Amino acid sequence: MDSYKTISREKVGEGYYTEKRSKFLAFSHHVDTVDDVKELVAQYRKKYFDARHVCWAYMLGHERTDFRANDDGEPSSTAGKPILGQINSRELTNVLVVVIRYFGGVKLGTSGLIVAYKEAAALALDDAVEEECLIEEQITYTFTYVMMNDVMRLSLIHI
């Protein structure tokens, strides 16, 4: 049977990383829809209203085709992309990682930002509980009674 990896709904993974007085708070969540993502990001923006940046990335679907990364004002590809990279490196899906940055007064540069967001995301994912889920599909067949033996034989072969 096919399966996919995700993180548990029961526990929010948390991580804390500092670099040159900047503080990075990271959180990983299980999500099922883009609406879940929007709601959680809005909650973090409200809770950490005084933070300089609230950057995030998500991956959705067992085929891992629905994803997005957001830098929230950081230089292009220095925040969201490294966060998404951590999700990808673990082959996870149905996951949102949010990283909140409090600026410490010292600029980190492009490579410093990439490392900081990557490390913070990794810490949050390390703290989460990974799960493997089976892909389930319900299939309904309609057939005549005469075909019963053939259908049963086929269904046993493909289960």
Where are these regions (language model features)?
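C-terminal regulatory domains involved in ligand/effector binding and gene-expression control
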Residues: 1-78
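Hydrophobic side chains in well-ordered alpha-helices
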Residues: 37-40, 117, 151-154
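Positively charged, aromatic-enriched nucleic acid-contacting surfaces
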Residues: 75-92
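Glycine- and acidic-rich phosphate- and metal-coordinating loops
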Residues: 93-103
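Stable alpha-helical structural segments in soluble proteins, enriched in small hydrophobic residues
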Residues: 116, 120-128
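Short glycine-/aliphatic-rich beta-strand segments at the starts of folded cytosolic domains
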Residues: 131-145
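Conserved small/polar residues in nucleotide/adenosyl-binding loops
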Residues: 157-159
